[in-house]
From Swiss-Prot:
Name used for this protein in its record: Octanoyltransferase
Native organism taxonomy: Bacteria, Bacillati, Actinomycetota, Actinomycetes, Micrococcales
Family, per entry: Belongs to the LipB family.
Catalytic activity: octanoyl-[ACP] + L-lysyl-[protein] = N(6)-octanoyl-L-lysyl-[protein] + holo-[ACP] + H(+)
Domain BPL/LPL catalytic: start-end pairs: 33-213
Organism for this UniProt entry: Leifsonia xyli subsp. xyli (strain CTCB07)
Amino acid sequence: MMQFDRSGLDGSPVDYETALQLQRRLHGEVATGTTAETMLLLEHAPVYTAGKRTTDDERPTDGTPVVDVDRGGKITWHGPGQLVGYPILRLREPVDVVGYVRRLESALIRVLGELGIAGERIEGRSGVWLPGDGTAPDRKLAAIGIRVAEGVTMHGFALNCSNSLEAYDRIVACGIRDAGVSTITEALGRTVTPQDAAPMVVAALQAEFGREAAPRAAQTETAA
């Protein structure tokens, strides 16, 4: 049974380093079988994080601090209004990392469809996108960057719900120069918050990964 933890959506954004330490602890416990698979859903305090393939020219030019992390992908931003999900799951053998990413994308495409948005994959690019229409370029709605060790996943996805896009102007988001970013709110013309999207995300991940979900015990919830 997969546990889910939405305590990071209580209105107090979670510091990135705090969440990272929790992920690492849970990863170790899931890997050894001492904790059930867990999905963390939260909002972060504003932060830039850089995956292993980030180059210097993609970072902020004004010296804004960036947290370097051990996930795939490049630089991105997290902050209030964005729903971040960290599934800590044991992948079935044989481990298929690309297949896992595609399943995360499928779950998020399902959520967007429920909201009335036709999110898509774009060949050669991870994440979920609004395709360009001749008046605007392809725009990313959800970024994905993961790590798998000992057959157990870490890191995850970031779904732009109602966040400002201003912070993206200071970086080359995900290392992609010929595309943009958007939010669910911008696409629909009405406000959709992380708290609004969270139940749909939980249901979509349950359906995609075939896990029954249960709330985490209070004593092990995320510390903000």
